[in-house]
Regions:
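The feature marks proteins involved in alpha-glucan
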Residues: 1-32, 68-172
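Glycan-recognition and catalytic regions of carbohydrate-active enzymes
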Residues: 19-24, 485, 494-514, 524-593
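Carbohydrate-binding surface patches
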Residues: 29-45, 565-608
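Conserved, mostly hydrophobic/aromatic
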Residues: 39, 89, 146, 200, ...
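C-terminal beta-strand-rich structural cap/linker in extracellular carbohydrate-active enzymes
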Residues: 41, 84-87, 628-649
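C-terminal accessory region downstream of the catalytic core in glycan-modifying enzymes
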Residues: 52, 477, 481, 527, ...
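Conserved alpha/beta catalytic core and glycan-binding cleft of carbohydrate-active enzymes
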Residues: 118, 350-351, 355-507, 514-518, ...
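Substrate-binding/active-site clefts of carbohydrate-active enzymes
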Residues: 149-328, 337-357, 363, 374-375
Length: 649
């Protein structure tokens, strides 16, 4: 019997790779006349399939042996129409038998324990064959991050009861606050806000919510993968039927596409929920990195980390992403802890996506860091190696986040908008997507994801309140914090790169000062649609800035000349001011932008460059650009805590 350390030595040998690397299909291959199951299990002595009628409970209908083929692949053919039938594998390795689901399962029963054979076209939504990924112009590429659960859990959201917290909530049109017919919520709200993409926190099958129990008190963000190619059952209206979660997930995607909104999937291939999972039960120790003593490396901070550099692990990751892109028409992928993947895997995946029809439009970006020390001994897909990554693989820029609002690990640490001394120097770096700074390696401005809040750490509103007050009143409509919120938005939404915001940032979302709510109560995590109506002025401010940004494409340009064209003014500290001319022929609404940031509590006077300048946003109203606002020249006044934007006419 091999020790974990001996398995590690074997798996990292060139001989093992040569004998077991396989490039063909794996998982179920369905036809009406029969289904072939293929499983890669090169270390197994014996493999059998267990057949079930149901996804939970019920006796096994029978067990059949799989036949061993070359390169570690086992297979069995099941005659007849197998759609809707469930199965597991029993894999015997080194004298130990493991019963497990199929790592390549397309759907599953309750809690993902039994895989289900699926004839996808049979259960697809009407007109699914006509659905397609949305082509979002670069100037509209703003990402709004939300959990399926949070989106519609609020009883006041107007969504029918059976769909609250589910995929189907994204399909209901005409919802309003408390169904009163006034303030739009959910899908209608999103369409009005004007974001280009919705980034969905994990929608694959995760293990931290029990699908067999009511969800009244259960909650988790879902960064606990169980089945990578299966939609999460708790987000469906019936987790006992494997086809329902697939159909309803596709209905959600089709609805967002019909609204002109792309769908980005938050993927967590860097670790799995438990070591007892389909990958580790099929080929123990292969898919996860190990320490020299054979124990699991824990660069994820969650107990294990995926070995993307091993050939069949790399194949699995790429196969899975391509499956979601093709079968579910996903518009982009956000990689959790991307620093745990090797550069070669990420670049190979980017090339594979590019090879799909219109695949170059699929977004790909991630967190360029790890959750702890790792046994990855290849180049990591992190900030330090940004130059090695494809120019179309983006990164979350914590430099931008921290300089604007302050560090995320110290609740009281201020940033530029809260008056941190000296921080104005780095605001210029953020504006130019750090292309003119030595704080990041050489990169394209479009690789930078500019943001100030995401699901991790404090919401922007809570951070602002924690810096301002010893005992914050989080639900209060604090005028100074509102002004700082507008300033923060005014900065990152005028930075080069791709903007990103946490759902609800635009209406002062609060989690009452809690910075890590991954398993807190549903009521704390859900979007508060009454608060959205209460802070409708802030919502309109974000909406106006999103529209303004779309009118000036050069802010979203990918060429090196664009950040180089930004001219910064010499102003009294801590004011920041700059201009950027429009690129020739890019269809911009103005010949140039001129932007000033004032992080003080006082009005400030500055001088505009020569020429005529239309006031587009004064830091309170961001929709002035839509109407006949005044044309300025000479000296102008900046409001306290404001981002003031002018367009040259």
């Amino acid at each position: 019997m091999k020790t974990p350390a001996e398995w590690k030595t074997l798996f990292e040998s060139s001989a093992f790779a040569r004998q077991t690397n396989y490039s063909g299909p794996l998982g179920p291959e369905y036809t009406p006349s029969g289904t072939r199951l293929r499983l890669w299990a090169p270390t197994a002595q014996k493999v059998s399939v267990n057949l079930y009628r149901r996804g939970d409970g019920g006796a096994c209908m029978g067990t059949l042996p799989l036949e061993q083929h070359g390169q570690g692949v086992w297979s069995v053919y099941l005659p007849g129409d197998q759609h809707g039938h469930y199965y597991t594998f029993t894999v015997e390795v080194d004298g130990t038998a493991y019963e497990t689901g199929d790592p390549y399962a397309r759907t599953a029963g309750v809690n993902g324990l039994r895989s289900m054979i699926l004839d996808a076209p049979r259960i697809d939504p009407p007109d699914w064959s006509h659905d397609h990924r949305v082509i979002v112009p670069a100037s509209r590429r703003t990402v709004w991050e939300v959990s399926v659960r949070d989106f519609s859990q609020d009883p006041a959201c107007g969504v029918r009861n059976a769909w609250r917290g589910k995929f189907m909530a994204f399909t209901q049109k005409g919802t309003t606050l408390s169904s009163a017919g006034t303030f739009p919520t959910c899908l209608d709200y999103l369409k009005r806000l004007g974001v280009g993409y919705v980034q969905l926190m994990p929608i694959f099958d995760f293990g931290s919510v029990d699908e067999s129990r009511p969800l009244t008190r259960q909650y988790n963000w879902g960064y606990d993968p169980t089945n990578y190619n299966v939609p999460e059952g708790s987000y469906s209206t019936d987790p006992t039927k494997g086809e329902v979660r697939v159909r309803e997930c596709k209905e959600m995607i089709a609805s967002l596409h019909a609204a002109g909104i792309g769908v980005i999937m938050d993927v967590v291939y860097n670790h799995m929920y438990r070591s007892e999972n389909p990958l580790n039960s099929t080929v123990p120790y292969y898919f996860f990195r190990q320490n020299p003593d054979g124990s699991f490396s824990n660069g994820s901070g969650c107990g294990n980390e995926f070995a993307s550099e091993r050939p069949m692990a790399r194949k699995y990751l790429i196969d899975s992403v391509l499956y979601w892109a093709q079968e579910y028409h996903i518009d982009g992928f956000r990689f959790d802890l991307m620093g745990l993947y090797d550069v070669d895997t990420m670049n190979e995946l980017r090339a594979a996506l590019d090879a799909l029809p219109c695949g170059r439009n699929i977004l790909m970006y991630g967190e360029p860091w790890q959750g702890g020390g790792s046994q990855l001994h290849r180049y990591e897909a992190n900030k330090a190696n940004l130059t090695m990554l494809s120019e179309r693989i983006g990164i979350f820029c914590d430099n931008t986040r921290d300089v604007i609002k302050g560090g995320c690990f110290d609740a009281r640490e201020p940033g530029y908008v809260e008056g941190r001394p000296g921080s104005f120097w780095d605001i210029g770096g953020a504006v130019a997507a750090w292309c003119r700074s030595d704080k990041l390696p050489a990169h394209s401005p479009s690789q930078i994801v500019s943001y100030v809040s995401a699901h991790d750490n404090f919401t922007l509103w809570d951070k602002l309140m924690l810096v301002r007050y010893a005992r914050p009143e989080y639900t209060a409509a604090d005028s100074a914090a509102l002004a700082q919120n507008r300033l923060a938005a005014g900065i990152y939404l005028t930075c080069m790169g791709m903007p990103f915001l946490q759902a609800g940032e635009e209406f002062a979302r609060t989690k009452k000062g809690q910075g890590n709510t991954y398993r807190s109560s549903p009521s704390l995590n859900r979007l508060d649609w009454k608060r959205a109506a209460q802070f409708h002025g802030l919502v309109d401010y974000y909406r106006g800035l999103l529209g303004l940004r779309a009118q000036f494409p050069r802010l979203s340009a990918s060429d090196a000349a664009s950040p180089a064209a930004i001219k910064f003014f010499s102003l009294e500290h801590p004011l920041v001011g700059w201009t950027l001319p429009a690129a020739p022929g890019d269809g911009a609404a103005w010949r140039a932008l001129c932007v000033f940031y004032n992080p003080t509590e006082e009005e400030k006077r500055v001088r505009l460059p020569d020429g005529q300048w239309k006031l587009l946003s004064d830091g309170v109203s961001s929709a002035l650009w839509k109407g006949p606002s005044r044309v300025c020249g000479g000296e102008v006044t900046l409001l306290p805590y404001s981002a003031t934007i002018f367009g040259q006419v």
